[in-house]
Every structure is written in structure tokens, then in C-alpha cells.
Swiss-Prot record:
PANTHER family: PROTEIN ARGININE N-METHYLTRANSFERASE, PROTEIN ARGININE N-METHYLTRANSFERASE PRMT10. The gene is PRMT10. It catalyses: L-arginyl-[protein] + 2 S-adenosyl-L-methionine = N(omega),N(omega)-dimethyl-L-arginyl-[protein] + 2 S-adenosyl-L-homocysteine + 2 H(+). This is Protein arginine N-methyltransferase PRMT10. Keywords: Methyltransferase, S-adenosyl-L-methionine, Transferase. It comes from Oryza sativa subsp. indica. GO terms for biological process: methylation; vegetative to reproductive phase transition of meristem.
Length: 382
């Protein structure tokens, strides 16, 4: 998750194309709410310590050095500058490293310290506003957010591609997929317990306020509970799952070709999938979402060695992205041979285009032929 702001111009166009979605993005507000985090070294360190992330990008660049040798590279949202430095070390003639935040100065320092300052030019600013002196052969970016599309940074990558990538250029990564899978988990019980503790505390507060100050706050109890139900039960939960928590077949709900994708294609994601249950006598407590990206080059200019970066549950540990857990309330008892049918919709929040609102309609088709009524739930990826 690198740092680069979505310009007001592109956001306005996105809103117009949607027929009235989010308002035009205020860059100062967007920076304060989102990008400022990426200006801190502690946050950059968290990403740089993610071995899965680092190994995938390092392998993609150096195992496919022919894409970089003697070429012009654009790093969108360079952050610490690590991808720009690798691109230079792989033989790039010139690297333009665009960064929105003051992390740009640290990126310049790292380029100098690693003897590539003559190749890597760090440009602080919005990708939508930056003007390069030439077209580029490669666009490299670590733009992925939770469940791939949270943060909406891919918009800026698309803008960069459409403005600056040569017709025979390549994207790093070149492809991406979003996955959904049925899981078992105790998170629902834990979150329900947290909710009840919060409500118990509220009830004591109501009693004390009336007792000490003569004001009855009980009229707000319903709103307080709804607020906390959203937080505890209807918000996506970050988790690093173990593979044995996945109780059925995972399904791809979205595939993206980074060379051709448009903002319209990613502004709203819709899918209908059927996921067979593979474990007997268990409970479907939630759905889990993750993503993978691939470095394949292009048809005209393929990679010598394809590399995959996956954020799927892994016995060897996870990534800083983890997986997103979407609680299903109520959970369902399931058996091997049952099928879970899910209709999924994800759209950008009207309040903040970097956050996502999701709706799941799920129904269980038992192996006996019995079909349970469909249940619809809303989940917020914030």
C-alpha cells in the first residue's frame, strides 16, 4: 500500500461517470484522512518488513530484468523508494518515483545512499498533476489495499498508465484477483461479547447520569446500540487466518488486467458464486476475502518468470494485508457436500471514496436438496 493521492480532477470525473456518487475529493481532507499515515517511517517499516510482499516484488524485478534494463520506469506512490531503487539496480536508464507525502525526501536520501540518485528522480506531488518529460516503458506500483481495492489507489495507477505508458509498455503487477471463501471462526462470539460489554457499560452510564445529574439518556440507547453493532458485527475484521479455517472452495469474484482496466470497472464489484463446503459437521461463521497479484508482463512483452504475490491464508504466516473477515449473522450449520451461494456487491462509500460498502446475500443449499432462506447482510470495509 503505497502513498499517492487521488486528484480532485479524476475524482470529479469518477463522480460524474457514476451519475452522482461521491463528491469531488478535497485533496487537503484526503491527505489528512489517509495519506499522512504514509509519511511516517514506522508505517513504511511495517510494509518493508512484510517478507511476502518484499520477496514477490524483488523476484518480479530481478527475475525479469529484461523489462527494466535500459528502460524508463515510473514508480507510482514510491513511499520509501524501495521499488524505484530495485528498478535502478536492475538496469533502468531512468526511474521517475512519484510520492505524495514528505516521505519523498527520505526516498531521495535512500537513492543517494544506494548510489542510484543519478537514475532515480523523486517527484513529490499528485500523480494526476505530475508532468513527466517522456513516456515510460514500465509502471511499477504497490497500490493494493485491504481486500485489494480499499484505498482506491489503483485509480492513480490507471491515470498514470493512460497518460504515460508506452503502447508496448508493461505493468508491475500486471494482473490481480479478488477471492472469497467460507470460513469457521470464533470471531462472531468474541465480537458479540464485546458488544454486550459495551451495552452494559452504556446502561450503567444511563443510570449514573440520571442519578447524579437528573438527565435521562435512555432515549439514545437504540442509536448507541446501532452504532456499536455496526462497529462490532457489521465492519470487516482484519485477521491472519489459518488455512484450516477455510471450510470450502474459495471463489474468484473479480479479475483485473492492470493494462486495460478502467476506473468504471473497479468502482463497483458484483459477483455471484457458489462455494462447495468440504468439511463435515461444522459452522459457517463468516466469509473471508483476500487477493493475489501476478507479474506476467504483457502479451507483447511477457515476463521471463511469472511471479505471484498472494495474501491467502498460509501456514507459514501472513502478510500485513491479512484477510478481511465478513461475519455472517446468524451463522449456519453446514456439512460436506452443501453449497453456499453468495451474491456480492461492493461499492465505494459516499462519505469517503477510499472506503467500501458491501452487501452479501447468502443461502445454503444442503446436500439433501433442502434450501434455506436467503439472508442479506451489509458489511463496511473502513
Amino acid at each position: 500500500m503505497a502513498s499517492l493521492p487521488n486528484g480532485a480532477a479524476s475524482a470529479s470525473a469518477a463522480s460524474s461517470a457514476a451519475g452522482g456518487g461521491p463528491a469531488v475529493v478535497d485533496k487537503e481532507v484526503d491527505f489528512a484522512n489517509y495519506f499522512c499515515t504514509y509519511s511516517y517511517l514506522y508505517h513504511q517499516k511495517e510494509m518493508l518488513c512484510d517478507r511476502v510482499r518484499m520477496d514477490a516484488y524483488h523476484s518480479a524485478v530481478f527475475r525479469n530484468a529484461h523489462h527494466f534494463r535500459g528502460k524508463v520506469v515510473l514508480d507510482v506512490g514510491t513511499g520509501s523508494g524501495i521499488l524505484a531503487i530495485w528498478s535502478a539496480q536492475a538496469g533502468a536508464r531512468k526511474v521517475y518515483a512519484v510520492e505524495a507525502t514528505n516521505m519523498a525526501e527520505h526516498a531521495r536520501e535512500l537513492a543517494r545512499a544506494n548510489d542510484v540518485a543519478d537514475i532515480v528522480e523523486v517527484i513529490q506531488g499528485s500523480m494526476e498533476d505530475v508532468v513527466l518529460p517522456e513516456k515510460v516503458d514500465v509502471i511499477i506500483s504497490e497500490w493494493m489495499g485491504y481486500f485489494l481495492l480499499r484505498e482506491s489507489m489503483f485509480d492513480s495507477v490507471i491515470c498514470a498508465r493512460d497518460r504515460w505508458l508506452k503502447p508496448d509498455g508493461v505493468m508491475y503487477p500486471s494482473h490481480a484477483r479478488m477471492w472469497l471463501a467460507p470460513i469457521r471462526s470464533d470471531l462472531a462470539e468474541n465480537k458479540m461479547e464485546d458488544l454486550e460489554i459495551a451495552m452494559h457499560d452504556w446502561n450503567l452510564f444511563v443510570e449514573d447520569t440520571e442519578s447524579y445529574y437528573g438527565v435521562n439518556m435512555n432515549v439514545l440507547t437504540k442509536a448507541y446500540r446501532a452504532e456499536h453493532e455496526k462497529y462490532y458485527l457489521k465492519s470487516a475484521i482484519w485477521n491472519n487466518l489459518h488455512p484450516n479455517q477455510v471450510i470450502g472452495q474459495a471463489a474468484v469474484i473479480k479479475e483485473i488486467d492492470c493494462l486495460t482496466a478502467t476506473v468504471d470497472e473497479i468502482r463497483e464489484v458484483r459477483a455471484q458464486v457458489t462455494m462447495p463446503i468440504k468439511l463435515d459437521m461444522t459452522r459457517l461463521a463468516a466469509l473471508a476475502g483476500w487477493f493475489d497479484v501476478h507479474f506476467r508482463g504483457s502479451k507483447q512483452n511477457p515476463a521471463t518468470q511469472e511471479v505471484e504475490l498472494s495474501t491467502a491464508p498460509d501456514v507459514n504466516g501472513g502478510t500485513h494485508w491479512g484477510q478481511q473477515v465478513f461475519l455472517l449473522t446468524p451463522p449456519l450449520k453446514v456439512n460436506e457436500g452443501d453449497n453456499v451461494k453468495v451474491s456480492f456487491t461492493m461499492v465505494r462509500s459516499k462519505e469517503n471514496h477510499r472506503l467500501m460498502d458491501m452487501e452479501f446475500t447468502y443461502e445454503l443449499h444442503e446436500s439433501s436438496g433442502k434450501q434455506l432462506p436467503a439472508i442479506t447482510t451489509k458489511i463496511y470495509l473502513e
